[in-house]
């Protein structure tokens, strides 16, 4: 029972990580070269797909960072994209779990009819 829960947790964390990588790579930075991510996250602007979806995201991002105390600006600057990435990853994991349970239900239902 514990092993089954650990496996489910590992699968959930895998999907969260995949969603996080997709968000940071595609939506925020527009690159999957992870060696560049630290330097690109240190810049003030998002450059990925999120700029097309929400055109004023960079203005909001700069305004939010500038409102913080000087000591916390760098911290907030990294937490915003990382936080959005984690939320996106959790959403991907939940959607994958829903699809898994839906397919499992449909397969069980199709065998019960026969």
From Swiss-Prot:
The keyword Protein transport does not apply. Its main location: membrane. The keyword Cell membrane applies. It is a multi-pass membrane protein. It comes from the Bacteria. The chain crosses the membrane at residues 9-29, 75-95. NCBIfam families: MPN385 (NF045751), MPN454_MG319 (NF045771). This is Uncharacterized protein MG267 homolog. The lineage of its organism: Bacteria, Bacillati, Mycoplasmatota, Mycoplasmoidales, Mycoplasmoidaceae.
């Amino acid at each position: 029972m514990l092993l089954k829960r650990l496996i489910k947790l590992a699968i959930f964390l895998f999907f969260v990580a995949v969603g996080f990588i997709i968000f940071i790579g595609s939506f925020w930075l527009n690159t999957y070269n992870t060696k560049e991510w630290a330097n690109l996250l240190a810049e003030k602007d998002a450059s990925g797909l999120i700029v097309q979806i929400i055109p004023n995201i960079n203005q909001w991002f700069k305004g939010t960072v500038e409102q913080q105390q000087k000591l916390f600006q760098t911290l907030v600057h990294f937490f915003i994209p990382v936080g959005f990435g984690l939320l996106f990853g959790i959403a991907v994991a939940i959607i994958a779990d829903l699809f898994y349970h839906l397919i499992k239900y449909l397969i069980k239902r199709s065998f019960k009819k026969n």
